[in-house]
Amino acid sequence: GEASPDFHQWTIDQDTTERVIGHAIDSGVNFIDTANCYAFGTSETYIGRALKRLGISRDRVVLASKVYFNEGHLSQEAINHEIDGTLKRLGTDYLDLYIIHRFDYGTPIEETMEALDALVKAGKVRALGASEMYAYQFHNMQVTAEANGWTKFTSMQCHYNLLYREDEREMIPVCRQYGVALTPYSPMASGHLARPKWNSDSKRSITDNTM
């Protein structure tokens, strides 16, 4: 996506995006995760354009995107609006996984879960995921979906790696209870666990404080 001076300064251009995705597919990687807010939507655009230019068929990739950091957060109106924008930017008519980026304190859980369930029933989304919230909030959302016969979450994207293991206390046990898969973010602690020296002179190492 397009770099911003104050958000994800380490992003790559379109040509590099295509090389990275092409190499990933050739290496057996097929899960591509993005969000409507990454690089202000241009991350989705670059990914969709790369898949088209590389001639990668839709059934060869698992596409995931997220919703929350937008006007209306997780209201029904916002979800319905944002999914259409995401699908258009990615150049597809469905997502394999749609993730709520955060818990929305301003919208009733029932409204959010019903809206997400409607996307699954409409064929715009195949599965639902959540990210970065308290375990009790995730549990309450699952209970709400279960009680109403709505689609439950099948994945949790939490902050989890060998250095940061807080979610082993409560979130991961809740995920086990519901048979929810983990798709952690920063699994290599922003690269710190993947190189012999703690720091490097890369733009991401200098500007990304996420461990």
List the model feature ranges, each with a label.
Residues 57, 73-101, 107, 159, ...:
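Active-site gating/metal-coordination segments in enzymes
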Residues 1-15, 67-80, 101-107:
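Active-site mouth loops of central-metabolism enzymes
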Residues 11-24, 73-91, 111-114, 138-143:
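Short, acidic/polar
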Residues 14, 103-211:
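Beta/alpha (TIM)-barrel catalytic core signal, keyed to glycine-rich beta->alpha loops juxtaposed to Asp/Glu
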Residues 59-71, 156-159:
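A short, structured active-site edge motif that brings together acidic residues
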Residues 17, 24, 32, 47, ...:
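Conserved, mostly hydrophobic/aromatic
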Residues 48-55, 83-88, 170-179:
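Short amphipathic alpha-helices and their capping/turn segments at secondary-structure boundaries
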Residues 1-61, 93, 121:
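N-terminal binding-site loop/beta-alpha segment at the start of enzyme catalytic domains
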